[in-house]
């Protein structure tokens, strides 16, 4: 049995969405994001195709902010390190190939260096153009590229001192589960949990899982996270003396509502970013239920709530919302489409998000958040700790076209308790 020796001393500990960030997992978008065409982009879960050169420039300052203020781990680096262990390498390659019906590649991949294997597990392994001309022309990759890997939040979620390996709704992302399970089990040495090991029909994704505090999860129920997945989370934490889960139903269309963090994120102890129709139960959210699940001594009670803010009040959160897109519905819909509600907290009251959503940034400014540029923070000209509340904005026109924002692209590993 393999005993991986290069574990880090950093422990998984995330008990809120806003505690000061001490460590984070990122993935720099690579050539995998261009290995699609308009005809098969939908198979990659994209609604458009991206330009890597532009993405590189946009992501540079995004990750630069994190490198300036916290410990950053990169998926590709950790994967390459894990693959240096022969047993782990064999296991990961075997599982990856079995999942995609190409077991015949195992021996060939095992002959390569850890760096090359990591590259092919992420960027894809092509059919031979001469040997498989039809398949090469139709699909090109026998091991599909991990087009969505830079959305590190989706496939895994730090939940307190454990990591939830999310049971993805689409097969194109299954290999991400295998990679994250290996990373968190062997590199970080933490317990991993998986809804599908409890029920094969259960699905969860990280964009739908938000940690309010040590006794509260907020969960989105929609096209990616289903009722069985929520039942698994309730079951997992039902042994605690008291625990609460707030469930917000999400529309299945359009694609911008795939996760809860596309319409709601925590900004501070008493502030949140929200898509206003979710609060008012209008437009796309008409008829979408909000439920407070109260677990007390193993007994479970269900309470219907008017909206998420009311549900949060029941569990001791008196939140003041800042509305994505300001106060005009058309602008709200435009900016929500490009992840205008999707902010990531670096510390209480200090968040990062897209600059392009100008009406949302103006609303934050009016709510007392100083508006900072990622370029200045990344290069050390501005310190977020000089401000009580701030929003770090980074320029992006290409990244939002992939369908996610700052929270989607970050997997927190360790935060201060608050």
Which functions belong to the PLM regions below?
Residues 2-418:
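The feature marks the mature, well-folded catalytic cores of soluble enzymes
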